[in-house]
Amino acid sequence: MCNFSNDEDRFGYIVDTPEIRGLIDETQRLMREITDDAERVEALQPAFAKLLGADGWLPEQYGSPDLESGMGGGIGQYALYRAEDGSLCLFSLVIPAGASTPIHDHLAWGLIGVYRGEQAETIYQRMDDGHDENRADLEVSKELRVREGEFYTLLPPADDIHYVTTISEGASVSIHLLANDTACVWRHKFEPEAGTVEAFRSGYSNAACVNEEREPVR
């Protein structure tokens, strides 16, 4: 059974299913019991894999593109769960066939996996020391293909800057479990050829951010 909260309810279970509750309960338990980020993420992998392997828990509208999204390119970013204190979120990211995300970071540990379709991920390593908030020297460090049911970890600063392209015939849907309120925190968008960095907040397609007009924090 799947229940929805009103999209104006910014926090908690925006989509409430046993599968999502099972993952969030396990994540919160491990956040209390394990202090090391890498150990916590490793311990979370079975529960995350279980969610990726389950059918029927993701509503159709949260697996569809969004032509008005803050990510651009028809990319939909749909909140499924958000902790009120900003410590955890679960969301789906829908990328149309052939479309790519901007090159961006996440600023949080977590897990990302493909629920539907197939993606190519290009990961960057930052070569400069970050002293200039408007500039970045990036080099490609890895290129991966991620298929349905496969996932990878995020443990910033390692491998935190990337972009993703859908390489399947239809839109891809990835599921993100991250230790912040990802779409509502100020992150960074990169242009490697120009060497520039821009603060951005992608926003959710189905839930509002608090303090929409707040200036970005560098």
Where are these regions (language model features)?
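Long hydrophobic alpha-helical segments typical of transmembrane helices together
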Residues: 190-218
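A short hydrophobic beta-strand segment most commonly corresponding to one strand
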Residues: 111-113, 169-184
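Short acidic-glycine-tyrosine-enriched beta hairpin
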Residues: 126-161, 203
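N-terminal leader/capping segments at the start of a protein or of a new domain
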Residues: 1-56
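A short glycine-rich, His/Asp/Glu-containing loop-to-beta-strand
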Residues: 69-97
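Glycine- and acidic-residue-biased ligand/ion/polar-headgroup-sensing regions
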Residues: 108-127
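Ligand-binding loop in jelly-roll beta-barrel domains
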Residues: 156-175
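Conserved short histidine dyad/triad with adjacent acidic residue
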Residues: 91-105, 155-159
